[in-house]
Amino acid sequence: MSTLELAAIGNAAVSALVDANGEIVWSCMPRPDADAIFCSLLRGTADAPRIGCFAVELLGQVRSEQEYVANTPVLVTRLFDAGGGAVEITDFAPRFRQFGRLFAPSQLVRTVRPIAGSPRVRIQLRPASGYGREPCARIAGSNHVRYPSEGGYVLRATTD
């Protein structure tokens, strides 16, 4: 990575940095002072192993655009391919009122949806432990995958 033009998402309990192509390149879980479970920002060269990443790759991508939804911390990244296909990635960390209090879970929400053509995407979810020293183990469930880290934190990814 040659640029530090990164977008931030967060909810005061957890935060992440997202690059212009929609990859989460830095996020510590379950708190900002914890181990960086997504840490591809530290990857030295393009041929270094891809661990500590959460990337949505559009095959044949030619450009991207990124913006925040007006007056919100919700980030929208659009990726466009050479054949007219496009996807929209929406990233945020929820924060809401529950039982009369403000609740900010250690959670990132990421949606990917096609917005034009027939785009082909590849999702790479490879959390790491020890600031990228080793990948987390992967345990598959019925509609989720768990990634226990060496520090005892378990990342759970669900999908529909």
Where would I find each of the regions flagged by the language model?
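Beta-sandwich/jelly-roll carbohydrate-recognition scaffolds of carbohydrate-active enzymes
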Residues: 2-160
